[in-house]
């Protein structure tokens, strides 16, 4: 629209990756680069020169490492925790990133969740499937709708799916009653310091899909929170504040909370763009 590149500039911040962190004499240091972000689809950022500094010199570190939660993720939270002890605000709190698995954390609010089972025991999982007939199976450390399976009643692939997901009974997974409301999409509610942003992103699955995730090809519509969305947010919010989880995304399908995203929640840009 004739806007200059300078006018489209959104922010200037310092940027670092996991590989940029080191510990020297008991203090976490980082190789930092200035990062300028532009509202431009083709050239959306520019990087500056590197410089070394203690993380304790920063006011805030926004930690946005995607799952899976592996040992490198674990080590990164420990390195960042040194800066946290020295007064830097880490978003989200390091201990809570380690403690709050995005699938399991939701089970702390059973009044908000659909019928589900967490197990690696094939017998228990098959019994859950027999009880509910139409079930979603998913790993505990995935993201973006990866490795999620819907298994209906009498599906001949049940055994091989469970063998694959559980690695023959060695890996714990989640089984969740299929929610027909997913046909109308799932809802991403963004939580800031335990309070829900008043608008959410309804993510609609592609034709023939069970997943509304944008990473799985879903499309998004920004809309006001429903009464049920607000109620779920009110149940979860105090615990988020207590745990220092300042920036979180709730996934809601119909009337049910399905996940609490604490590592790298998305959809804020889509909501901001639609509602300013």
Question: For the regions a protein language model found, what residue spans apply to each?
Answer:
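Single conserved hydrophobic/aromatic residue that forms the stacking wall/gate
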Residues: 1-12
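Structural detector of well-ordered beta-strand residues that form the stable sheet scaffold
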Residues: 14, 90-91, 136, 174-176
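Conserved N-proximal alpha/beta basic substrate-recognition cap immediately N-terminal to
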Residues: 16-118
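Short glycine-rich anion-binding loops that position phosphate/pyrophosphate groups of nucleotides
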Residues: 65-68, 140-142, 265
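Short glycine-enriched loops at secondary-structure junctions
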Residues: 94-97, 203-205, 253-256
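Phosphate-binding site of ATP-dependent enzymes
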Residues: 122-123, 130-134, 141-230
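ATP-dependent carboxylate activation and anion-phosphoryl transfer catalytic cores
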Residues: 207-208, 224-276
